[in-house]
């Protein structure tokens, strides 16, 4: 009996996870769906994660953990003005919407939608992934093993 319960529980969890998975689609389907997102207003966005990058032989780390933004008069404002680089990077990410994605005709980009939106692009053995919720708000940005996530509060 316990085995049957575990089996049905596992089957149920699998069905739930498959129901909320992204579905690969064409660019036209992706952009059409992205233009029809429902409107919701979040009042707070909190970032987590680090972005490590190298330029001209110098490695830098941008730690976004704990960086917060509040929405005032329709615009995102950084909660800590002492984190200038995090504030600028965060504002750019908060403004990035799925409807802003341009079509990549090289075949290196895949588009997904269903329970939110996702774009996955691979070039020079480096993969970048952007994910948005159903309302078009960025929830995750990954590049070359670095991931920055955003959580929202209404």
Regions found by a protein language model. Name each.
Residues 15-50, 91-94, 105, 115, ...:
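N-terminal leader/targeting segments and the immediate start of mature chains
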Residues 16-19, 32, 38, 59, ...:
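Intrinsically disordered, low-complexity segments enriched in Ser/Pro/Gly/Ala and basic residues
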Residues 1-20:
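Sec-dependent bacterial lipoprotein signal peptides
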Residues 58, 63, 110-154:
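Gly/Pro-enriched, hydrophobic low-complexity segments
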Residues 15, 27, 44-47, 60-62, ...:
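N-terminal compositionally biased, intrinsically disordered segments and leader/signal-like regions
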Residues 48-103, 147:
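An acidic-aromatic
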Residues 40-44, 99-124:
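Short, positively charged, low-complexity/disordered linker segments
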Residues 16-22, 41, 50, 62, ...:
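Serine/proline-rich low-complexity intrinsically disordered segments, especially terminal tails, linkers
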């Amino acid at each position: 009996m316990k085995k049957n319960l575990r089996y049905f529980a596992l089957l149920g969890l699998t069905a739930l996870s498959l129901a909320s998975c992204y579905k690969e689609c064409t660019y036209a389907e992706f952009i059409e769906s992205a233009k029809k997102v429902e409107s919701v207003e979040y009042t707070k966005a909190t970032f987590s994660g680090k972005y490590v990058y190298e330029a001209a032989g110098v490695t830098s780390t941008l730690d976004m953990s704990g960086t917060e933004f509040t929405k005032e008069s329709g615009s995102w404002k950084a909660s800590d003005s002492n984190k200038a680089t995090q504030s600028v990077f965060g504002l750019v990410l908060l403004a990035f919407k799925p409807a802003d994605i341009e079509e990549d005709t090289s075949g290196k980009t895949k588009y997904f939608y269903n329970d939110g939106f996702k774009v996955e692009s691979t070039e020079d053995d480096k993969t970048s992934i952007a994910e948005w919720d159903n309302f078009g708000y960025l929830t995750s940005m990954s590049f070359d093993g670095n991931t920055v996530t955003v959580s929202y509060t209404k």
